[in-house]
Amino acid sequence: MTEISRQAYADMFGPTTGDRVRLADTELWIEVENDLTAYGEEVKFGGGKVIRDGMGQGQMRARACVDLVITNALIVDHWGIVKADIGIKDGRIFAIGKAGNPDIQPNVTIPIGVGTEAIAGEGKIVTAGGVDTHIHWICPQQAEEALVSGVTTMIGGGTGPAAGTNATTCTPGPWYIARMLQAADSLPVNIGFLGKGNGSNPDALREQIAAGAIGLKIHEDWGATPAAIDCALTVAEEMDIQVALHSDTLNESGFVEDTLAAIGDRTIHTFHTEGAGGGHAPDIITACAHPHILPSSTNPTLPYTVNTIDEHLDMLMVCHHLDPDIAEDVAFAESRIRRETIAAEDVLHDLGAFSLTSSDSQAMGRVGEVILRTWQVAHRMKVQRGPLAEETGDNDNQRVKRYIAKYTINPALTHGIAHEVGSVEAGKLADLVLWSPAFFGVKPATLIKGGMIVCAPMGDINASIPTPQPVHYRPMFGALGAARHHCRLTFLSQAAVENGIAQQLNLRSATAVVKGCRTVKKADMIHNSLQPNITVDAQTYEVRIDGEPITSEPADVLPMAQRYFLF
């Protein structure tokens, strides 16, 4: 067999087993763990290449071949870092393995035929589309901004730029839930809505789930009392939905211990568990130690930088309808912004004690920076703390798997949608993001939604080729016309499906049911299941694990920043 150099092979077919790839301009390096394509039998599209009739393309009809093949891609997911071909059929991932013509090639698991389109994955990284579980639906344009960052699923609540939505992620009541389901029907992302969980009458909560909400949000601005927490969780246990909690910063209705007592042993998703985004001051961060609490961060405190503290006060005053001329409002804001707990948050992510990242879109968070900021934290922690103890070899594979799980599979598990999205696995909706390694986590090369390209960088439309400047992201055919309804999902509760809500509202998009929300625990959070013994000093706010202080230094320079956004 003829041999070529490793560099020449990587240039032609992408990296293979043992090759290392740098992620953007970070200090994170991944190493290919396995290559499922066969040396000498690789498929590639183009003039004089392999995917031609009678060669890499077989004679089978459409029913026997995939609709789309992504060739020689480097998959980065919670389960591995693997080189493979990816086959997509009927909008879902058909297989991950070896593509080609089974009539003449061995071990083909992804048949290519006349009905197959090809996307060149050589030299590209493929990840699952991100899942952002903390969306304030203040404006519909957030969907586009999130999509071009690599997020394909958005869970949250709201009704537009109302005071309630500016502060809380709730879509309150059946009428608003119906209108928002109709409004979101043509947005190019998967969507699920959270109803308002602040109430002590279970029927007022049940009717929101029956109307189409996939969960309930309890927010202190509506009153996060122990009674409301208990009521929402009681309904959740009945109807298999998730509850998200923004707890009581002011400790008016109780302290963190009272909230934990109200929760009991029932699963709950605690938002911005560090506390700058809201929650019992100063020790809501201790909630991450409990087996039934699924802790997430929002991105304004990620990573901790020299500007983090100064930025937060004004953000908080605006988002929570506070008055800078009222001393009590200023004191409320200042109680939430603690340098010590923010400095500990990055470390808790690196240890796998915090399980999810999210945005808090336009309500103290940036909807287009969930992925970017997650990787900035990973970079900062490698620089400050060195390689993880679990690493083997000269790579950061275990750290990368930990961090990618925070915005893909773990939020999907938390909200009962992991059977549909959240990872690059056969059977799931083909929501995939292609990245050039130099732009990983910052600017995607191609966004695939339900098997179709939904958005991509595109050059001058009047040019003779697709690449001349100006190049910017444009919607593609997967985001247009009736096709968009086939390429996205609206998530509903089982009760809403049984009530025929999609038919009542004339929803055109495909729907999917959330399930398993009440059985998921911290131990199920992939690569992020640590339950540390954590304490916070009430006077100094110092955070300790098993008696040892944990902190990090603020960054004054970050990767994935200015050099990527000059134009």
Curated annotation (Swiss-Prot):
One of its GO terms (biological process) is urea catabolic process. Pfam families: Amidohydro_1 (PF01979), Urease_alpha (PF00449). Transmembrane segments: none annotated. One of its GO terms (cellular component) is cytoplasm. GO terms for molecular function: nickel cation binding; urease activity. The keyword Cell inner membrane does not apply. It is found in: Cytoplasm. It is an enzyme of class 3 (hydrolase). This is Urease subunit alpha. It comes from Citrobacter koseri (strain ATCC BAA-895 / CDC 4225-83 / SGSC4696). The gene is ureC.
